[in-house]
């Protein structure tokens, strides 16, 4: 096992512990708590994959951080902070929408890279809006926290979330997963739109119809789906 992989995990465990203390002392806001919960799932998955105990890793991570801080000068710390771009947290969904439990009559789940896509195949002929909470850096989507698909009535019928065991994903991973979710929902004649906020930071533009600009790969995948459906309809006739 690579030593840098282990030390990175140990430091992440300790930093999560520090952030948890901030929450316990009621010094955090909703986005901070949201990221803490997401990172907890990620650390559990990484610990299982690496075969490392989180409590022991946290202790070692503390020693690593203390050593770095002891050697770090105040001036170097100021320069590092000044040169690091700050990310912003974007919220399409309210806390209630983000934390609400939902159920599927005909569940379907698909893993696309480091992201998990879930949708209810029982939903038909509905107008659906995709909304997401995510972080942004340099005006581009950085990290997806959670994406959900809502009907006009407010019911949740689909979701995209990061896999805890596969930390880290790119903007292309997110766009590909959105394309898969849209294709799955449109299979049952649903009309799917993407929030303007998500369009802006994921694609850098917005579509008046609410549809994101799809990649050639996504377009081919959706075209194959449409052709298969037409063939089935002809056979049924």
Swiss-Prot record:
Alphabetized InterPro entries for the sequence: NS1, NS1A, NS1A_effect_dom-like_sf, uS15_NS1_RNA-bd_sf
GO MF terms, alphabetically ordered: protein serine/threonine kinase inhibitor activity; RNA binding
Chain spans, region Disordered: 205-237
Keywords, comma-separated and alphabetical: Eukaryotic host gene expression shutoff by virus, Host cytoplasm, Host gene expression shutoff by virus, Host mRNA suppression by virus, Host nucleus, Host-virus interaction, Inhibition of host innate immune response by virus, Inhibition of host interferon signaling pathway by virus, Inhibition of host PKR by virus, Inhibition of host pre-mRNA processing by virus, Inhibition of host RIG-I by virus, Inhibition of host RLR pathway by virus, Interferon antiviral system evasion, RNA-binding, Ubl conjugation, Viral immunoevasion
Motif (Nuclear localization signal) on chain: 34-38
Stretches for region PABPN1-binding: 223-230
CPSF4-binding: annotated span: 180-215
Locations listed in the record: Host nucleus; Host cytoplasm
Motif interval(s): Nuclear export signal: 137-146
One example of a Gene Ontology biological process annotation: symbiont-mediated suppression of host type I interferon-mediated signaling pathway
Chain positions covered by the region annotation RNA-binding and homodimerization: 1-73
SS bonds (residue pairs): none
Compositionally biased residues, Basic residues: 217-237
An example Gene Ontology CC term for this record: host cell cytoplasm
Family in the record: Belongs to the influenza A viruses NS1 family.
Subunit-structure text: Homodimer. Interacts with host TRIM25 (via coiled coil); this interaction specifically inhibits TRIM25 multimerization and TRIM25-mediated RIGI CARD ubiquitination. Interacts with human EIF2AK2/PKR, CPSF4, IVNS1ABP and PABPN1.
Domain notes: The dsRNA-binding region is required for suppression of RNA silencing.
Listed name of the protein: Non-structural protein 1
Organism, as annotated: Influenza A virus (strain A/Hong Kong/5/1983 H3N2)
